[in-house]
């Protein structure tokens, strides 16, 4: 009750930049979190901006001001004195500039994924956060899935033993988004000029938490390889015709990109990026991490989140020598993460099984209590850097590429993730 009263007395004031599919979802969630106001919204698409402004008014909140004069009108929004935080859900190339400007203005920065597309941008985020003392949180929702958090709890309790290997893949058929009004979408244009794992943070976020990356261990180096590129052109020709203006566009991005990472402590991680070939979405009613392959292997057992299966040696039935999978559902009662047990009911009904809500709620809680965000700027830089590093590796015929140490040595003594229960 004390927290609720405090939230009501002093609302967290958030500006939102970009209200397309993701940003409009953020607006809805922010309006549903007690003690949050949205004084300002920015988008160059006036139709989307008007819809977001209408949503704020319909929720009975104070009127929000709109900003739509041009691609950099977010600077006027950030300059306002009545904002505590800024959330960006724009195309990727704007994530870093907006987050940097927000931190320089003394406002918490919450950025959609990835936080950066180049190593220089990664360092801009780190340097700005360190210089200003203002947190920057990557809004990586997949870290907050019920399954991902339960796996974290299993790791922290030692149930899976010492972690040796993880696998994760963003395997999501998004070909329907290649064209927008007959032309290449902004995301498709990224695929024209870049060849690497362009969207690594969904799988690597939970994996980094499970393996204490930047908190006792760090990624050392990676090797990446890309398949040939066929899926996007095939899709355009099949559904829009051989004579479509974009049917012969040369896409640099391979259909499947595979990256292997090794940590300083010797943990290996295999990531895949696969978004341009036919595949159904997860249809498992019990799935907690849809659209991804995710696996966590320890010396005592294995968690296969995308299959909703687990095996712990010696705990599977009366014959401990029998090797067989168990469903993960019974494990939630005993090993469900405290964050989900405390706030899971609030998250019910929101996108991606509620993980979107919990992610944004944790950002708001950090702003409200003026503490560090659970996913901090070092995580944002490290996870996002995989894109640029994988591009380097592929361009060099799959040469090993070292990870920068964005923590500058502090990874050895940094505290574990601090969740905020309120």
Residues of each region from the PLM?
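N-terminal glycine-/serine-/threonine-rich beta1-alpha1-beta2 phosphate-ribose binding loop
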Residues: 1-108, 123-135
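Predominantly a Rossmann-like dinucleotide-binding segment in NAD(P)-dependent oxidoreductases
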Residues: 18, 22, 132-137, 142-251
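Hydrophobic residues in well-ordered beta-strands that form the structural core
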Residues: 88, 111, 136-138, 167, ...
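ADP-ribose/adenylate-binding Rossmann-like module
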Residues: 105-118
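C-terminal capping/lid region of NAD(P)-dependent oxidoreductase domains
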Residues: 134, 161-165, 393-409, 419-422
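C-terminal glycine/acidic-rich active-site capping loop/insertion
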Residues: 231-250, 258, 262-263, 300-375, ...
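Glycine-rich phosphate/pyrophosphate-binding beta-alpha loops
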Residues: 253, 267, 272-290
């Amino acid at each position: 009750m004390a927290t609720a009263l405090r939230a009501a007395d002093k609302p967290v004031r958030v500006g939102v930049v970009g209200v397309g599919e993701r940003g409009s979802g953020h607006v809805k969630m922010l309006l549903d979190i007690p003690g949050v106001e949205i004084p300002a919204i920015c988008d160059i698409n006036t139709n989307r901006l008007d819809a977001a402004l209408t949503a704020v008014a319909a929720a009975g909140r104070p009127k929000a001001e709109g900003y739509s004069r041009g691609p950099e009108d977010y600077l006027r929004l950030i300059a306002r004195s009545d904002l505590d935080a800024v959330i960006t859900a724009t195309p990727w190339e704007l994530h870093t500039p907006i987050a940097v400007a927000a931190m320089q203005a003394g406002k918490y920065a919450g950025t959609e994924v990835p936080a950066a597309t180049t190593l220089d941008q990664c360092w801009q985020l780190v340097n700005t956060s360190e210089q200003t003392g203002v947190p920057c949180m990557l809004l990586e929702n997949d870290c907050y899935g019920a399954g991902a958090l339960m796996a974290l709890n299993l790791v922290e309790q030692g149930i899976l033993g010492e972690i040796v290997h993880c696998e994760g893949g963003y395997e999501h058929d998004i070909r329907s988004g290649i064209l927008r009004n007959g032309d290449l979408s902004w995301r498709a244009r990224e695929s024209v000029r870049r060849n690497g794992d362009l969207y690594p943070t969904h799988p690597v976020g939970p994996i980094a938490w499970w393996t204490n990356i930047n908190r006792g261990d760090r990624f050392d180096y990676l090797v990446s390889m890309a398949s040939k590129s066929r899926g996007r052109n095939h899709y355009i020709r099949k559904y829009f015709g051989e004579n479509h203006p974009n049917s012969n566009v040369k896409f640099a991005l391979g259909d499947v990109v595979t990256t292997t990472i090794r940590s300083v402590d010797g943990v290996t991680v295999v990531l895949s990026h696969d978004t341009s070939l036919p595949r159904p979405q997860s249809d498992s009613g019990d799935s907690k991490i849809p659209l991804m392959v995710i696996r966590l292997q320890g010396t005592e057992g294995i968690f296969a989140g995308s299959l909703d299966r687990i095996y712990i040696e010696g705990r599977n039935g009366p014959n401990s020598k029998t090797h067989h999978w168990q469903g993960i559902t019974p494990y939630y009662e005993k090993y469900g993460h405290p964050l989900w047990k405390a706030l899971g009911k609030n998250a019910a009904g929101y996108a991606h099984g509620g993980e979107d809500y919990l992610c944004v709620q944790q950002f708001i809680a950090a702003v409200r209590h003026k503490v560090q965000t659970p996913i901090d700027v070092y995580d944002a830089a490290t996870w996002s850097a995989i894109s640029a590093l994988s591009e380097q590796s592929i361009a060099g015929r799959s040469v090993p590429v070292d990870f920068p140490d964005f923590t500058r040595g502090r990874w050895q003594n940094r505290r574990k993730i601090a969740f905020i229960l309120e």
